[in-house]
């Protein structure tokens, strides 16, 4: 029994609401869930909360591309995220969204307190402006070369390669992500958070034990470079919360995102009146708050976040725990290799408990990257969980049921039981310190001992002799009791298996009951609890991940399989039947304005045999075009796709209406037509050069 009950609030970083969860994401949620489940198993009051990070430029852009409201898009993504987490047995106490009334009020509260305490500065800045779209370009509207490490193709707020943060104006060779134009400078009024005012507090906090040593050392480098005032403003258009008393100005997503932890807990408090928000977040709180994050967002969580909390009168977290990235088969996750695996694709093929165990077996308290080697994954799960753990019960339970009325014997020799129980503090310390890999090794070493005991005793031989029936009863009862202890130790990692084992033993598995005497206790008939990992299922998962390359959030509909098949059967020598036209000069070609367009709507045209009516978004303007592709496409195949159109073709009045351009397609005609589909990174309105 825990000596005293702790009050704990634990969070995982908020997944961004513009796409699906993948196995790289799942590392963090499994890591946090194991820690939360362990705390609850020890009898502590632990609340595990999370939310979707639902604001910012990327979400606004994607919603525009899909032709739907941002609110509708994030609601759908939230639903998908929650289902993925639930199916991986991640047990949040509350899952919310940063686009909520609780979060709006909390963000405004913290901002106003910072402002009133003198930590918000206002000044006019020169910001990048898109001359073609007549709009300011916030961070994610701009891409260019990182000013720190010189990595190309980086966003305007932080570098994915080196983790540095900067303003969009610092980018080298910036380009508008909206139009592709080179931006110009224009003045605008912005609000800044005075981060340098908290340097002393932050230096003390970062060396207080709140961070891993690797993180604290990295922060020392940033302190040496000097802290900068932090721009917390974004100009309209922006999907987020408007700043109080500042029409047309919005909170930068990284201001209200971590506040989402507080907003989600506020939402939980409303559902559970016995919970007190101030008891966990008040300045003098004695409760514990822990954040689990990826190493790519250390800067925000270890500098901006504690400073914002301190400056607005709230408590700082006890610790921020960072983890590394996930690689697959020793390399970065790859769509072309099928190793960029979505959570849902994994769930379609494999048991989530497999991955929970594999991640646990390789996790430590350090910030090292974790490699998901798919061959090792199958071998380890089969060896540890099936061959060692579950096999311990499957080899012995049948004898108890068939020969001893399903009742366990009183164990006379408790030497093994005592040895297993003696490891509970070691295993507990490993869970507490997030050294899950060490905990798994301790548990599997015990499983080896238990299996060796059964193999040496050979109860299947004992039961053949009348004078060894009681000895067989003792061996099998002892083995099952050891199995119960092992699964109790593993309950935070394997909750579904633990549930099955609880049904088998017909009693709950609790840490306090590890030493429970089960003499005379009746068990249920044994049922298979875990199947081996079959490599053909792993390979099918990888194959499906390759197929998923054709299904992106930007283009949710793909061509029908029969069209794809036809594409490979078209003549390999099209130039024979359709030779290249006469040469033109460059000036003639330059007159043609080709633009990326998104097909917002497609519909049949009454009394037209060949035409479909298309509504095309070309980036702030909608065009109506009649296209002769009815023989090759149905309207539902087209909606949401990107294509290429001739944007400066003179409008043509047809008897069905005005056609304001032309979409481009390839093929001999009839059903053998394929509209041009640009790379998913292209945006409506971009010029094709």
Curated annotation (Swiss-Prot):
Short name of one Pfam family: tRNA_bind
Alphabetized UniProt keyword annotations: Aminoacyl-tRNA synthetase, ATP-binding, Cytoplasm, Ligase, Metal-binding, Nucleotide-binding, Protein biosynthesis, RNA-binding, tRNA-binding, Zinc
Chief subcellular location: cytoplasm
Residue numbers binding Zn(2+): 146, 149, 159, 162
GO cellular component, one term: cytosol
Chain ranges for the short sequence motif 'HIGH' region as given in the UniProt record: 15-25
Motif ('KMSKS' region): 332-336
Coiled-coil ranges per UniProt: none
Superkingdom as given in the UniProt entry: Bacteria
Enzyme Commission number(s) from the entry: 6.1.1.10
Residue stretches making up the tRNA-binding domain: 588-689
GO BP terms: methionyl-tRNA aminoacylation
Subunit comment: Homodimer.
PANTHER family: METHIONINE--TRNA LIGASE (PTHR45765), METHIONINE--TRNA LIGASE, CYTOPLASMIC (PTHR45765:SF1)
Entry function: Is required not only for elongation of protein synthesis but also for the initiation of all mRNA translation through initiator tRNA(fMet) aminoacylation.
HAMAP family noted in UniProt: Met_tRNA_synth_type1
Protein name: Methionine--tRNA ligase
Protein species of origin: Shewanella baltica (strain OS195)
Gene field: metG
